[in-house]
Amino acid sequence: MRDVTTTHDRVRHIGGFVLAVVVAITVASLVTDPDDPAQVIPAGAAVAGPPDPIEQLLTAQATALTRGDQTGWLKPVAPSLRKRYLDLFRSLRALHVTTVDYRITTRRQPTVQVELSYCFVGARCPKDGPKIAQKLTIKSNVIVVEAAADRPTDLQPTPWESGDLVFAQGKRVTVGAPPALRSRLKEITKIADSAAVVDDRFAAYAGNRQPRYRLFLATEKLWRSWYGGKATNWAVGYMQPLGAAGADVVINPGRLTTTAALREVIQHELGHVATIAGVTSRHEDMWLVEGVAEYIGSQPRRAYDTYNREALTKPKALAARPLRDGADDDEVAAFYAQGHFAVDCLVTAFGEPRAMEFVRQRLRLSLSLDDASRSAFGTDFRHVTTTCVDWMSHQVG
Protein backbone atom coordinates (compact mmCIF):
# COMPACT_ATOMS: atom_id res chain seq x y z
CA MET A 1 0.00 0.00 0.00
CA ARG A 2 1.28 3.44 -0.91
CA ASP A 3 0.56 6.09 1.69
CA VAL A 4 1.30 9.78 1.23
CA THR A 5 0.68 12.19 4.10
CA THR A 6 1.14 15.92 3.64
CA THR A 7 0.91 18.97 5.84
CA HIS A 8 0.73 22.65 4.95
CA ASP A 9 3.69 24.25 3.35
CA ARG A 10 3.32 28.01 3.54
CA VAL A 11 5.58 31.03 3.82
CA ARG A 12 4.85 33.85 6.18
CA HIS A 13 5.86 37.45 5.75
CA ILE A 14 5.64 38.98 9.21
CA GLY A 15 7.59 41.92 10.53
CA GLY A 16 9.91 41.87 7.51
CA PHE A 17 10.96 38.26 7.97
CA VAL A 18 10.26 35.19 5.87
CA LEU A 19 9.82 31.80 7.47
CA ALA A 20 9.55 28.51 5.67
CA VAL A 21 7.56 25.60 7.00
CA VAL A 22 7.96 21.97 6.30
CA VAL A 23 6.28 19.99 3.62
CA ALA A 24 5.92 16.77 5.58
CA ILE A 25 5.47 14.10 3.02
CA THR A 26 5.77 10.54 4.28
CA VAL A 27 6.05 7.89 1.56
CA ALA A 28 5.53 4.19 2.26
CA SER A 29 6.76 1.92 -0.52
CA LEU A 30 4.69 -0.67 -2.31
CA VAL A 31 4.46 -3.94 -0.38
CA THR A 32 4.36 -6.96 -2.65
CA ASP A 33 3.00 -10.41 -2.05
CA PRO A 34 5.65 -13.13 -2.45
CA ASP A 35 3.04 -15.17 -4.30
CA ASP A 36 2.34 -12.32 -6.74
CA PRO A 37 3.91 -13.05 -10.16
CA ALA A 38 4.39 -9.30 -10.67
CA GLN A 39 6.49 -9.05 -7.52
CA VAL A 40 9.54 -6.80 -7.71
CA ILE A 41 12.65 -8.97 -8.09
CA PRO A 42 15.98 -7.65 -6.77
CA ALA A 43 18.73 -7.60 -9.37
CA GLY A 44 21.13 -10.38 -8.56
CA ALA A 45 18.66 -12.27 -6.35
CA ALA A 46 19.01 -16.04 -6.27
CA VAL A 47 16.68 -17.60 -8.84
CA ALA A 48 16.30 -21.04 -10.32
CA GLY A 49 18.18 -21.72 -13.53
CA PRO A 50 21.17 -19.94 -15.09
CA PRO A 51 22.06 -16.40 -13.94
CA ASP A 52 20.12 -13.66 -15.68
CA PRO A 53 22.58 -11.52 -17.71
CA ILE A 54 20.60 -8.29 -17.26
CA GLU A 55 20.38 -8.76 -13.52
CA GLN A 56 24.11 -9.49 -13.43
CA LEU A 57 24.85 -6.37 -15.47
CA LEU A 58 22.78 -4.10 -13.24
CA THR A 59 24.11 -5.63 -10.03
CA ALA A 60 27.70 -5.14 -11.18
CA GLN A 61 26.97 -1.55 -12.18
CA ALA A 62 25.31 -0.73 -8.85
CA THR A 63 28.22 -2.29 -6.96
CA ALA A 64 30.67 -0.18 -8.95
CA LEU A 65 28.81 3.02 -8.06
CA THR A 66 28.71 2.11 -4.38
CA ARG A 67 32.47 1.57 -4.22
CA GLY A 68 33.30 4.63 -6.34
CA ASP A 69 34.43 2.67 -9.41
CA GLN A 70 33.70 5.07 -12.27
CA THR A 71 35.05 2.71 -14.92
CA GLY A 72 32.86 -0.15 -13.70
CA TRP A 73 29.80 2.13 -13.58
CA LEU A 74 30.31 3.28 -17.18
CA LYS A 75 31.33 -0.13 -18.57
CA PRO A 76 27.84 -1.25 -19.74
CA VAL A 77 26.81 2.21 -21.03
CA ALA A 78 26.65 3.15 -24.73
CA PRO A 79 28.85 6.10 -25.82
CA SER A 80 25.77 8.28 -26.37
CA LEU A 81 24.84 7.91 -22.67
CA ARG A 82 28.29 8.19 -21.12
CA LYS A 83 28.01 11.88 -20.21
CA ARG A 84 24.58 11.34 -18.70
CA TYR A 85 25.83 8.42 -16.59
CA LEU A 86 29.06 10.17 -15.67
CA ASP A 87 27.09 13.18 -14.39
CA LEU A 88 24.84 10.88 -12.38
CA PHE A 89 27.88 9.09 -10.93
CA ARG A 90 29.46 12.38 -9.87
CA SER A 91 26.22 13.64 -8.31
CA LEU A 92 25.62 10.53 -6.23
CA ARG A 93 29.24 10.34 -5.12
CA ALA A 94 29.12 14.02 -4.13
CA LEU A 95 26.06 13.18 -2.00
CA HIS A 96 28.06 10.40 -0.27
CA VAL A 97 25.92 7.54 -1.54
CA THR A 98 26.56 4.32 0.37
CA THR A 99 23.99 1.89 -1.05
CA VAL A 100 22.65 1.47 -4.57
CA ASP A 101 20.48 -1.39 -5.82
CA TYR A 102 18.53 -2.06 -8.99
CA ARG A 103 15.23 -3.94 -8.99
CA ILE A 104 13.66 -5.07 -12.23
CA THR A 105 9.92 -4.45 -12.19
CA THR A 106 8.85 -5.12 -15.80
CA ARG A 107 10.48 -6.82 -18.80
CA ARG A 108 9.57 -6.26 -22.42
CA GLN A 109 12.82 -7.16 -24.12
CA PRO A 110 14.95 -5.32 -24.92
CA THR A 111 13.39 -2.79 -22.53
CA VAL A 112 13.20 -3.21 -18.77
CA GLN A 113 11.55 -1.01 -16.16
CA VAL A 114 13.74 -0.75 -13.07
CA GLU A 115 13.78 0.92 -9.69
CA LEU A 116 17.08 2.26 -8.41
CA SER A 117 17.04 2.38 -4.61
CA TYR A 118 19.65 4.39 -2.75
CA CYS A 119 20.83 5.52 0.66
CA PHE A 120 23.30 8.18 1.70
CA VAL A 121 25.98 8.23 4.38
CA GLY A 122 24.85 7.38 7.90
CA ALA A 123 21.35 6.27 6.90
CA ARG A 124 19.82 3.02 8.06
CA CYS A 125 19.02 1.64 4.63
CA PRO A 126 15.66 -0.18 4.76
CA LYS A 127 14.35 -2.59 2.14
CA ASP A 128 11.59 -0.11 1.31
CA GLY A 129 13.98 2.85 1.10
CA PRO A 130 13.88 5.76 -1.35
CA LYS A 131 14.02 4.94 -5.04
CA ILE A 132 13.68 6.33 -8.53
CA ALA A 133 12.21 4.51 -11.53
CA GLN A 134 13.88 4.25 -14.94
CA LYS A 135 13.22 2.66 -18.32
CA LEU A 136 16.32 1.06 -19.82
CA THR A 137 16.84 -0.45 -23.24
CA ILE A 138 19.64 -3.04 -23.08
CA LYS A 139 21.05 -4.68 -26.20
CA SER A 140 24.00 -7.08 -26.21
CA ASN A 141 24.67 -6.23 -22.55
CA VAL A 142 24.90 -2.50 -23.29
CA ILE A 143 22.50 0.17 -21.99
CA VAL A 144 21.61 2.05 -25.18
CA VAL A 145 18.59 4.07 -24.01
CA GLU A 146 17.68 5.51 -20.60
CA ALA A 147 14.25 7.13 -20.47
CA ALA A 148 11.55 8.25 -18.07
CA ALA A 149 9.75 5.35 -16.45
CA ASP A 150 6.13 4.62 -17.23
CA ARG A 151 5.39 4.99 -13.51
CA PRO A 152 7.74 7.41 -11.73
CA THR A 153 8.00 7.14 -7.96
CA ASP A 154 6.50 9.76 -5.67
CA LEU A 155 9.96 11.27 -5.17
CA GLN A 156 10.57 11.98 -8.83
CA PRO A 157 12.15 13.97 -10.13
CA THR A 158 14.70 14.10 -7.34
CA PRO A 159 17.06 17.10 -7.40
CA TRP A 160 20.05 14.92 -8.29
CA GLU A 161 18.75 12.49 -10.90
CA SER A 162 19.23 14.89 -13.83
CA GLY A 163 22.94 14.78 -12.99
CA ASP A 164 23.59 18.45 -13.75
CA LEU A 165 24.02 19.77 -10.19
CA VAL A 166 27.18 21.40 -8.90
CA PHE A 167 28.16 20.76 -5.29
CA ALA A 168 29.92 22.37 -2.37
CA GLN A 169 31.08 20.35 0.62
CA GLY A 170 30.85 22.22 3.90
CA LYS A 171 32.01 20.86 7.23
CA ARG A 172 28.53 19.55 8.07
CA VAL A 173 26.40 20.16 4.98
CA THR A 174 26.55 19.07 1.35
CA VAL A 175 24.90 21.70 -0.83
CA GLY A 176 23.79 21.00 -4.40
CA ALA A 177 22.66 23.60 -6.91
CA PRO A 178 21.85 23.82 -10.62
CA PRO A 179 24.42 25.71 -12.72
CA ALA A 180 22.22 28.83 -12.62
CA LEU A 181 22.76 29.07 -8.85
CA ARG A 182 26.45 28.15 -8.82
CA SER A 183 27.34 31.68 -7.67
CA ARG A 184 25.29 31.21 -4.47
CA LEU A 185 27.00 28.00 -3.36
CA LYS A 186 29.84 29.47 -1.32
CA GLU A 187 27.60 31.95 0.51
CA ILE A 188 24.84 29.49 1.31
CA THR A 189 27.19 26.66 2.29
CA LYS A 190 28.78 28.96 4.88
CA ILE A 191 25.34 29.89 6.25
CA ALA A 192 24.22 26.25 6.28
CA ASP A 193 27.33 25.10 8.14
CA SER A 194 26.72 27.77 10.78
CA ALA A 195 23.07 26.71 11.10
CA ALA A 196 24.09 23.05 11.34
CA VAL A 197 26.05 23.75 14.52
CA VAL A 198 22.77 24.76 16.17
CA ASP A 199 20.82 21.89 14.63
CA ASP A 200 23.43 19.39 15.79
CA ARG A 201 22.64 20.31 19.38
CA PHE A 202 18.99 19.43 18.91
CA ALA A 203 19.78 16.28 16.92
CA ALA A 204 21.77 15.13 19.96
CA TYR A 205 18.80 15.81 22.23
CA ALA A 206 16.62 13.77 19.85
CA GLY A 207 19.07 10.87 19.68
CA ASN A 208 19.16 11.48 15.93
CA ARG A 209 22.68 12.71 15.18
CA GLN A 210 23.29 13.37 11.49
CA PRO A 211 26.59 12.42 9.80
CA ARG A 212 25.84 15.15 7.24
CA TYR A 213 22.92 17.28 6.14
CA ARG A 214 21.89 17.60 2.47
CA LEU A 215 20.60 20.90 1.12
CA PHE A 216 19.44 21.57 -2.44
CA LEU A 217 19.00 25.04 -3.96
CA ALA A 218 16.15 25.40 -6.45
CA THR A 219 15.40 27.92 -9.17
CA GLU A 220 11.76 28.92 -9.61
CA LYS A 221 11.33 26.33 -12.38
CA LEU A 222 12.95 23.51 -10.42
CA TRP A 223 11.01 24.52 -7.30
CA ARG A 224 7.83 23.55 -9.13
CA SER A 225 9.32 20.25 -10.30
CA TRP A 226 11.56 18.59 -7.70
CA TYR A 227 10.01 15.86 -5.59
CA GLY A 228 6.92 15.83 -7.75
CA GLY A 229 6.35 19.58 -7.58
CA LYS A 230 4.81 19.34 -4.12
CA ALA A 231 6.14 22.73 -2.98
CA THR A 232 3.61 25.55 -3.31
CA ASN A 233 4.01 29.13 -4.40
CA TRP A 234 3.82 30.16 -0.74
CA ALA A 235 6.82 28.20 0.50
CA VAL A 236 10.51 29.06 0.47
CA GLY A 237 11.82 25.80 1.93
CA TYR A 238 10.79 22.29 2.91
CA MET A 239 12.12 19.09 4.39
CA GLN A 240 11.53 16.01 2.23
CA PRO A 241 11.38 12.82 4.31
CA LEU A 242 12.99 9.70 2.86
CA GLY A 243 11.47 7.32 5.40
CA ALA A 244 13.94 5.49 7.58
CA ALA A 245 16.71 6.59 5.17
CA GLY A 246 16.66 10.18 6.44
CA ALA A 247 15.61 13.43 4.79
CA ASP A 248 16.63 16.12 2.31
CA VAL A 249 16.09 19.87 2.53
CA VAL A 250 15.19 22.10 -0.43
CA ILE A 251 15.12 25.91 -0.37
CA ASN A 252 14.28 28.55 -2.96
CA PRO A 253 16.98 31.19 -2.37
CA GLY A 254 15.47 33.56 -4.92
CA ARG A 255 12.67 34.23 -2.43
CA LEU A 256 15.01 34.91 0.47
CA THR A 257 16.43 38.39 0.21
CA THR A 258 18.56 38.64 3.36
CA THR A 259 21.23 36.60 5.08
CA ALA A 260 19.06 36.54 8.22
CA ALA A 261 16.15 35.04 6.29
CA LEU A 262 18.39 32.42 4.67
CA ARG A 263 19.85 31.45 8.02
CA GLU A 264 16.47 31.16 9.71
CA VAL A 265 14.89 29.10 6.94
CA ILE A 266 17.85 26.72 6.70
CA GLN A 267 18.10 26.36 10.48
CA HIS A 268 14.35 25.69 10.68
CA GLU A 269 14.38 23.04 7.96
CA LEU A 270 17.51 21.33 9.24
CA GLY A 271 15.72 21.42 12.60
CA HIS A 272 13.08 19.14 11.09
CA VAL A 273 15.84 16.78 9.95
CA ALA A 274 17.32 16.82 13.47
CA THR A 275 14.02 16.08 15.22
CA ILE A 276 11.90 13.92 12.90
CA ALA A 277 14.08 12.50 10.09
CA GLY A 278 13.76 8.72 10.01
CA VAL A 279 10.36 8.55 11.70
CA THR A 280 6.78 9.24 10.64
CA SER A 281 5.20 12.20 12.42
CA ARG A 282 1.48 12.29 13.18
CA HIS A 283 -0.74 15.03 11.79
CA GLU A 284 -2.06 15.76 15.28
CA ASP A 285 1.49 16.63 16.38
CA MET A 286 1.81 19.45 13.87
CA TRP A 287 1.89 21.99 16.71
CA LEU A 288 4.95 20.29 18.22
CA VAL A 289 6.69 19.44 14.93
CA GLU A 290 6.49 23.05 13.77
CA GLY A 291 6.85 24.56 17.23
CA VAL A 292 10.20 22.91 17.88
CA ALA A 293 11.42 23.81 14.37
CA GLU A 294 10.42 27.43 15.03
CA TYR A 295 12.28 27.32 18.33
CA ILE A 296 15.38 25.88 16.63
CA GLY A 297 15.16 28.17 13.62
CA SER A 298 15.05 31.34 15.71
CA GLN A 299 18.03 30.43 17.91
CA PRO A 300 19.64 32.13 19.75
CA ARG A 301 16.55 34.35 20.09
CA ARG A 302 13.58 33.31 22.19
CA ALA A 303 9.98 33.49 20.97
CA TYR A 304 9.23 36.86 22.55
CA ASP A 305 12.15 38.39 20.61
CA THR A 306 10.77 37.30 17.22
CA TYR A 307 7.98 38.40 14.90
CA ASN A 308 5.91 35.51 16.27
CA ARG A 309 5.01 37.67 19.26
CA GLU A 310 3.00 39.92 16.94
CA ALA A 311 1.04 36.94 15.60
CA LEU A 312 0.37 35.21 18.92
CA THR A 313 -3.28 35.02 19.98
CA LYS A 314 -4.67 33.88 23.30
CA PRO A 315 -4.46 30.06 23.26
CA LYS A 316 -7.21 27.66 24.26
CA ALA A 317 -4.90 24.64 24.51
CA LEU A 318 -1.22 23.83 24.42
CA ALA A 319 -1.58 21.11 21.77
CA ALA A 320 -3.31 23.18 19.10
CA ARG A 321 -5.32 21.44 16.42
CA PRO A 322 -3.55 21.08 13.06
CA LEU A 323 -4.10 23.77 10.48
CA ARG A 324 -7.18 23.24 8.39
CA ASP A 325 -6.94 22.97 4.62
CA GLY A 326 -7.30 26.40 3.08
CA ALA A 327 -6.23 28.26 6.23
CA ASP A 328 -5.61 31.95 5.54
CA ASP A 329 -2.41 33.82 6.29
CA ASP A 330 -3.58 35.06 9.69
CA GLU A 331 -4.50 31.52 10.79
CA VAL A 332 -1.15 30.19 9.60
CA ALA A 333 0.75 32.96 11.37
CA ALA A 334 -1.17 32.42 14.62
CA PHE A 335 -0.67 28.65 14.46
CA TYR A 336 3.08 28.83 14.06
CA ALA A 337 3.36 31.54 16.66
CA GLN A 338 1.45 29.39 19.14
CA GLY A 339 3.63 26.36 18.38
CA HIS A 340 6.77 28.44 18.88
CA PHE A 341 5.54 29.86 22.19
CA ALA A 342 4.34 26.43 23.33
CA VAL A 343 7.84 24.98 22.99
CA ASP A 344 9.36 28.14 24.47
CA CYS A 345 7.11 27.68 27.49
CA LEU A 346 8.27 24.09 27.96
CA VAL A 347 11.85 25.35 27.92
CA THR A 348 11.06 28.21 30.31
CA ALA A 349 9.21 25.99 32.77
CA PHE A 350 11.39 22.87 32.69
CA GLY A 351 14.67 23.75 30.97
CA GLU A 352 15.79 22.95 27.44
CA PRO A 353 17.10 19.40 28.05
CA ARG A 354 13.83 18.22 29.62
CA ALA A 355 11.73 20.03 27.02
CA MET A 356 13.66 18.35 24.23
CA GLU A 357 13.33 14.98 25.97
CA PHE A 358 9.56 15.49 25.86
CA VAL A 359 9.86 16.25 22.13
CA ARG A 360 11.94 13.10 21.58
CA GLN A 361 9.56 10.83 23.46
CA ARG A 362 6.51 12.18 21.68
CA LEU A 363 7.81 12.59 18.13
CA ARG A 364 10.38 9.80 17.89
CA LEU A 365 9.16 7.21 20.40
CA SER A 366 5.43 7.88 19.89
CA LEU A 367 4.60 8.01 23.59
CA SER A 368 1.28 9.58 24.51
CA LEU A 369 1.40 13.25 25.49
CA ASP A 370 0.68 12.29 29.08
CA ASP A 371 3.31 9.54 29.24
CA ALA A 372 5.93 11.77 27.62
CA SER A 373 5.04 14.57 30.03
CA ARG A 374 5.26 12.38 33.12
CA SER A 375 8.57 10.93 31.96
CA ALA A 376 10.21 14.23 30.99
CA PHE A 377 8.59 16.64 33.45
CA GLY A 378 7.38 14.47 36.31
CA THR A 379 3.81 15.69 35.94
CA ASP A 380 0.81 15.00 33.72
CA PHE A 381 0.19 16.84 30.46
CA ARG A 382 -2.95 18.51 31.81
CA HIS A 383 -0.84 20.31 34.42
CA VAL A 384 1.71 21.30 31.77
CA THR A 385 -1.12 22.60 29.57
CA THR A 386 -2.55 24.73 32.38
CA THR A 387 0.88 26.18 33.15
CA CYS A 388 1.74 27.00 29.55
CA VAL A 389 -1.66 28.30 28.45
CA ASP A 390 -1.51 30.76 31.36
CA TRP A 391 2.08 31.73 30.52
CA MET A 392 1.32 32.16 26.81
CA SER A 393 -1.78 34.24 27.55
CA HIS A 394 0.41 36.71 29.40
CA GLN A 395 2.69 37.01 26.34
CA VAL A 396 -0.12 38.15 24.03
CA GLY A 397 0.06 41.77 22.99
Residue spans for each PLM region:
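Short beta-strand edge/turn micro-motifs at domain boundaries
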Residues: 2-12, 37-39, 125-165
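Short, low-complexity N-terminal intrinsically disordered segments enriched in polar/charged residues
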Residues: 16-67
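Short solvent-exposed beta->alpha transition segments
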Residues: 46, 56, 62-63, 67-109
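A short hydrophobic beta-strand element
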Residues: 107-120
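Zn2+-dependent metallopeptidase catalytic core
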Residues: 121-126, 137, 180-232, 263, ...
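Zinc-dependent metallopeptidase catalytic helix centered on the HExxH motif
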Residues: 239-312
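Post-HExxH zinc-binding segment in Zn-dependent metallohydrolases
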Residues: 279-327, 375-395
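Pan-zinc metallopeptidase signature
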Residues: 324-397
